[in-house]
């Protein structure tokens, strides 16, 4: 339905898909753990995600792209509240845990999680924690773009974010200009 709206088709020239995949692997991305909570039973869920970016400053909002086959995708369609936890360079083990190397039931045993006013767990030791309320969801191809209006945002001035590029973790550091 919305795929037609966006002109989605599978007519990409041969090889473009693989070349695009290789190209995107070389884009450094900030590593986040997105958390949400199922209704009623306080069943918490989280997943490592790198497809996150700001949308607008007025109103403050960001977008998250999630594969349609993930449980987090289904959860965000049902529950509007989620938190984007931007991990620090020291939180690789957390990223690994939430990327599927640890069962969903065990993931929150890593780290010192606290419950936000919206009922969702967040990580106070993260580089940043951005609480959002879903205001839109747009399917496209294998993924859905979720837009979240920011309800609170906190960032640490003493940590650096964890990055991921070419299937490995990277450190963020200021770049110097040569004279």
UniProtKB/Swiss-Prot annotation:
Induction: Induced in the presence of gamma-resorcylate.
EC number(s) given by UniProt: 1.5.1.37
Pathway participation: Aromatic compound metabolism
Broadest EC class assigned to this enzyme: oxidoreductase
Catalysed transformations (reactions): FADH2 + NAD(+) = FAD + NADH + 2 H(+)
Molecular function (Gene Ontology), one example: riboflavin reductase (NADPH) activity
SUPFAM superfamilies: FMN-binding split barrel (SSF50475)
NAD recorded as keyword: yes
Keywords for this protein: FAD, Flavoprotein, NAD, Oxidoreductase
Family to which the UniProt record says this protein belongs: Belongs to the non-flavoprotein flavin reductase family.
Summary of subunit composition and partner proteins: The FADH(2)-dependent resorcinol hydroxylase is composed of two subunits, GraA (the oxygenase component) and GraD (the reductase component). Both subunits are required for activity.
Role, per record: Involved in the gamma-resorcylate (2,6-dihydroxybenzoate) catabolism. Reductase component of the resorcinol hydroxylase, which catalyzes the FADPH-dependent conversion of resorcinol to hydroxyquinol. Catalyzes the reduction of FAD by NADH. The reduced flavin is then transferred to the oxygenase component GraA.
The name this protein goes by in its record: FADH(2)-dependent resorcinol hydroxylase, reductase component
Organism listed in the record: Rhizobium sp. (strain MTP-10005)
Gene from which this protein is expressed: graD
